[in-house]
Amino acid sequence: MTESIEMTRCRTLRRMRSLCWVLLALPLAAGASLADANLADFPRRAGETDDAPRFRRAIDAAANGILEVPRGEYAIASPLVVTNRCSLEMHPAAHLVATREMDFLLTWAAAGDYVSLTLFESDGRIYDNLGLFVRGGDIDGNGLASCLRLSNAHHFTLANVTLHNGRRVGLEVSRGEKGYLYELVANNVYAKCNMKGLAGNVGIDIGVSDCHLTDIFVIDYTVGIRVRGSSNRLTRCHVWGGTVPPKGMGVREWSTLYGESKRRPWTPEAEREMLAKGLPEMLAGSVAFDIRGWEHTFDGCYADTAETGFRVAGGNAILSRCGFYNNPRMGLRKSTAIVHRGGRLLVDSCCFNGGAGCERLYEASGDTTLLWRTNIAQGGADMAAEARKLAENAGRRD
């Protein structure tokens, strides 16, 4: 009898544990959302031929809240501007496409005196919501518009966003019209052009200070990442190009030719065949990292196939554990790892590899100071010899 009671107690405890796990899982199973509004609840109205008006209604409904944007194709024929501190949580396959010419498809610029140290509500309370963000989505300028501009916030998060085919720029972080922004935290941003006719544009343009960018990829914007302002920190940012084909070729034709060249030995004959097709459109005049302003730090960043890997113009900058490479199959036969045009530059524990036999390691002019520490260089037009010379003269002022 005693054993039977004990067994009953054990069964009861097991059932109670199972019930607890079921209750804990219910919110997840129900697809609970933290959003204050969902774009799906704001359909197009009669006479509307694109999705911009419904976006505006949804944004208005989520002031200082979160707007959820589900998967879908969204035609945007006029600019979207967020001024009410509405954060955007977008499905990775939420594809916002510009269908008419405009400056930016999406601008996030909260209303308020962000130039001052502290922001106040109308009733005098301090406004200190530092959790504002844009996450997810594919913002496609479609060659008609720049993709995204961020302005006017104290601490802001940008994550898991794709920026396609920005006409002038993929992402611009700026003061805008009398605005101010610092402490942008950007992670897993993917900026890429996959259409022709956009040469001369910029993937990411940081015109403010105190921002942190991590795990950023920029592909086939003529200037990959431009950094101005001061004290910005970039970690594991990779800029490369060559997917947009040379003039006279289609994307599929160029992609197939490149794939075939990878599957066979790289011989002088194969090289001549690739070079005969011309230079991929976005590589002419390309700069992976355009460094301006003051006190910027680049850690583990990779300049991969550009005419200029790191262009440093004024101020002070640090390159630490960064890399440079020129892919010979892309056709660049003029490439320099570092072009130094002003200020002090510390290069430490970096690796430079010239793949096409033509690359230069370092070129300087103007008022510059180079500090060269424990770097590796090989290939190119004798980059190893250049590195030895730089090491001997480390700390010199040109």
What are the language-model segments listed below?
Residues 20-29:
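Bacterial N-terminal signal peptides
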Residues 77-79, 92, 97-103, 142-148, ...:
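Short glycine/acidic-rich loop motifs that flank beta-strands on beta-rich extracellular proteins
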Residues 43-46, 64-102, 139, 143:
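N-terminal extracellular ligand-recognition/capping segment immediately after the signal peptide
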Residues 87-89, 108-166, 182:
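Parallel beta-helix/beta-solenoid
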Residues 69, 87-91, 114, 129-135, ...:
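All-beta strand scaffolds that present successive hydrophobic residues in beta-strands
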Residues 1-16:
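N-terminal secretory signal peptides that target proteins for export/translocation
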Residues 31-57:
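Right-handed parallel beta-helix/beta-solenoid
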